[in-house]
Amino acid sequence: MKTLVLKISGKFVSPYDTPLVEGYAKTLEALRRKYKLAVVVGGGSVARKYIELAPPSKGLKDLIGIEVSRLNALLLSMHTPSAKKVIPKSASEVLELWDGEDILIVGGLQPGQSTNAVALVVAELVGADLVVNATTVDAVYDKPPSQPGAKRIEKIKARELQRLLESFDWKNEPGRYELMDSIALQIAERSKIPIAVIYGGEPERIPSIVEEEAWGTLILP
């Protein structure tokens, strides 16, 4: 049985959309029947609101974002019967809690690290074969997808993607980590972990997308 890490944008797991949270819970149960499964949840718009109200220290803003992401992870775990109800707060706790049987759901771990990076750290720790990034866009594009003429990239190397994202002039700010940050890509490269990017707004489609490998973009290590 292969091991899968599913990264879910915090936008899709929030107290403002119970049906979407419940939809993800059903998706996790479906995936668990075929894969050993760990899940990493972002902070989303709730985290960004708290971060806006936080003191100017980026470290403190990160801490607030981490706490919100853990709360989102706990919310999802409560809706998912096969999930552990304890949210790890460190890499060592991930190792202690991981058994390959129950679904392990994780939020943020430490300041300066996006939940995309956390997903790759978790993937390293549990020996995952693949990270699936269920995000707010359906794929990686050759320029910001909001711009006219943006073209979908079917496959791209992690190092090439890092250069591409740098050309977009996106900044890694607390609560504003875009698509995939450099730490996540470096971990993917060093541990040879592929990342599949898909649209996460329709969780009921994710099991078939994974089964058919119908990725928006496949990021190769």
From Swiss-Prot:
Entry keyword Transferase: yes
HAMAP family, alphabetized: PyrH_A
Keyword Transferase attached: yes
Binding, UMP: 43, 62, 109-115
Gene designation per UniProt: pyrH
Organism: Ignicoccus hospitalis (strain KIN4/I / DSM 18386 / JCM 14125)
Name of the protein in its database record: Uridylate kinase
Assembly behavior: Homohexamer.
Primary subcellular site in the record, as a coarse category: cytoplasm
Any GO molecular function: ATP binding
EC numbers: 2.7.4.22
